[in-house]
Amino acid sequence: MSKLLARAKAKRFSAENSYHNMALDDAYIDECCFNLQQAIEFSLKYLVEMSGEQYVENHDIRAQMNKLKRLNAFIPSEDKLRLYASTINSWKVETRYNDKFVALIEDINEIRIIADELIKYCESLVRIE
């Protein structure tokens, strides 16, 4: 079985830890955003694998979502995820290589919810099998 769900959960846990330390240093904002992006990416790739297919070999969450749509698979929070896709995708690189990276707390809070809903849905699939 794939380690993608375990990785998604670990990244989400790391994001939450960084979230609670954001007031200490901007580095925690970077870490929070990067780990949220990773949690969502791994969750979507997990859903593709659970649909019996190989996920798209890139970091663009829209590519995973488009593949899931072609497979007629359910995507939790799909509308919100599409709305925030550009922001989430940018966090993969911006948080690591852009010293002037800035994230809106409102975006972080919405994306935390999206990540939680995705992981919760993925976990429900494990229990069904």
Predicted region positions:
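Terminal alpha-helical segments
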Residues: 1-129
